[in-house]
Amino acid sequence: MKIFEAYTIKNMCLKNRIVMPPMCMYSSDNTGNINDFHLVHYTTRSIGGVGFIIVEATGITPNGRISDKDLGIWSEKHAEGLSFLVKEVKKYGSKIAIQLNHSGRKYEGTSGEPVAPSALAFDENSKTPKELTKNEIKEIILAFKAAAKRAEKAGFDAIEIHGAHGYLINQFLSPLSNFRDDEYGGSTENRTRFLKEVLEAVREVWPKEKPILLRVSAEDYRGGSGITPNEMVNIINIVKDLIDVVDVSSGGVAPAHINLYPGYQVKLSEVIKNECNVPTIAVGLICDINMVEEILSNNRADLVALGRELLRNPYFVLSSARLKNINIDFPKPYERAFN
């Protein structure tokens, strides 16, 4: 089965095609440091056989977190704690990345004010953010760069830049949240400029042999007034030379009705993969091994991320291998349960 085939991106060889996507656990404290929960949470999925684990959205600045309970990577102390997590996860054969994020106008903590490309609140219950100056934009780009350097120091196999779900990069990309009239607003090319400059800065410090992933929301679900899959194709083509994989999600930049069903975002991965000729990760209420195999076998994505399913069942990969009589290496202490 394709699900159990290895997959190589640059120097990173994954033992299977299953990804644990970044999911905020809101389990840190105001320091942004990892704790015992994070160690158990991620290491358990590695023991369970997941090929690629992406650590949750991690703030590049204190007010770049989504909440005060999110992880941070704005200090050297954060890198030290993350380094221990990386070592533990790698012991069991998984590769590990970290998602670098700035929440922008969606920041709900107490370590500063929310900022955004334009002074427009997410909804009527949200704070109105401060519009970023050009100098402040440059400072955030440098913060992404510094965070990437710390991620390398911590030993991560890859990094993912968070450009989805209505956070700062997504806010620049979408015409629903970006009303600037300078070089960072207006046309698709201008709205992509911030993302491009972030990626260029990160490329300067991130090892060339290690992958850079980009997570995007390929559909705003606002009847064409926001980002559509076709515009996301254009955005990806602008930055394609700076990334190695596109992690394709959707929604989050503005309130919208989304019709949810198993695999509802897979079609977006398929569009990006085929139109941009880049490897993709598919995600979106995928919880069945046969669905995973269909996605991979029909070339709709190169990797498949299971969010809720891996929260429910950390041993999805092991139990699926047993179900399908696939011979894989089971963790020694657990062999009797699966052989």
Curated annotation (Swiss-Prot):
One Pfam family here: Oxidored_FMN
Biological process, per Gene Ontology: response to toxic substance
Record carries keyword Magnesium: no
Main function: Catalyzes the reduction of the double bond of an array of alpha,beta-unsaturated aldehydes and ketones. It also reduces the nitro group of nitroester and nitroaromatic compounds. It could have a role in detoxification processes.
| Binding residues for substrate | Y26, H162, G163, A164, H165
**What cofactor(s) does the depicted protein rely on?**
FMN
Name of the protein in its database record: NADPH dehydrogenase
So which domain of life are we looking at? Bacteria
According to the record's subunit comment, the protein's assembly and interactions are:
Homotetramer.
Its source organism is Clostridium acetobutylicum (strain ATCC 824 / DSM 792 / JCM 1419 / IAM 19013 / LMG 5710 / NBRC 13948 / NRRL B-527 / VKM B-1787 / 2291 / W)
A GO molecular-function descriptor: NADPH dehydrogenase activity
Q: Which family, according to UniProt? A: Belongs to the NADH:flavin oxidoreductase/NADH oxidase family. NamA subfamily.
Which gene is the coding source of this polypeptide chain? namA
